[in-house]
Amino acid sequence: MARRILVVEDEAPIREMVCFVLEQNGFQPVEAEDYDSAVNQLNEPWPDLILLDWMLPGGSGLQFIKLLKREAMTRDIPVVMLTARGEEEDRVRGLETGADDYITKPFSPKELVARIKAVMRRISPMAVEEVIEMQGLSLDPSSHRVMTGDSPLDMGPTEFKLLHFFMTHPERVYSREQLLNHVWGTNVYVEDRTVDVHIRRLRKALEHSGHDRMVQTVRGTGYRFSARF
């Protein structure tokens, strides 16, 4: 599935060029020409990344970032600012407000795509990874599927993220706090016991195939994902 990118840019020639480049590189661009239309695009399916101009009719890029960070469903969407404001102070303001990267106009299409991919690797590794396999269990980040052989396993989005983290970090013990930081993120305030709830749900989802044994409790420490039973 193509990664969905919201392009928020009021200058039509730049917006159209960016969308063309994104399509040529396998992304799915969604256009917004001003602040209000950008806000209206914040719904499911959520964008995987937002390219955001600094100055917009109806509001500023910084205001838009602040709006994103206030809402639980949008606060983790990565943002790359796309603007003519190249002064160091402006770059710092953008990054401190919550932007993940900053591209100054004019820019090359190659640099734009490279920066988008770099941000996705850093912020959302599942967006660029191949299928992960372990002991007959396979997880495909692109299609968001977990399989055992030809049989799909049904699980919620949090359990999927938890399993993805475990399968990319096997044989290591993680405390509840570490799992919260890695899977939920440092900006989300939830209790440690939330991890236990989702561990139980993950085990339940893996139970039919027998892979629930791989999610192991390490008493007094936390949890480990292991092929050693």
From Swiss-Prot:
Keyword Cytoplasm: yes
UniProt xrefs under InterPro entries: CheY-like_superfamily (IPR011006), OmpR/PhoB-type_DNA-bd (IPR001867), Sig_transdc_resp-reg_PhoB (IPR011879), Sig_transdc_resp-reg_receiver (IPR001789), WalR-like (IPR039420), WH-like_DNA-bd_sf (IPR036388)
Short name of one Pfam family: Trans_reg_C
Posttranslational modification: Phosphorylated by PhoR.
UniProt-annotated location(s): Cytoplasm
DNA-binding region, residues: 129-227
Gene Ontology BP terms: phosphate ion transport; regulation of DNA-templated transcription
Listed GO CC annotations: cytosol; protein-DNA complex
Modified positions (4-aspartylphosphate) in chain numbering: D53
GO molecular function: phosphorelay response regulator activity; transcription cis-regulatory region binding
Keyword set, alphabetical order: Activator, Cytoplasm, DNA-binding, Phosphate transport, Phosphoprotein, Transcription, Transcription regulation, Transport, Two-component regulatory system
Keyword Ribonucleoprotein part of the UniProt annotation: no
All residue ranges annotated as the Response regulatory domain in the record: 4-120
PROSITE patterns per record: OMPR_PHOB (PS51755), RESPONSE_REGULATORY (PS50110)
Predominant cellular place of this UniProt entry's protein: cytoplasm
Bilayer-crossing regions: none
Role of this protein: This protein is a positive regulator for the phosphate regulon. Transcription of this operon is positively regulated by PhoB and PhoR when phosphate is limited.
Name of the featured protein: Phosphate regulon transcriptional regulatory protein PhoB
Organism: Klebsiella pneumoniae
Gene: phoB
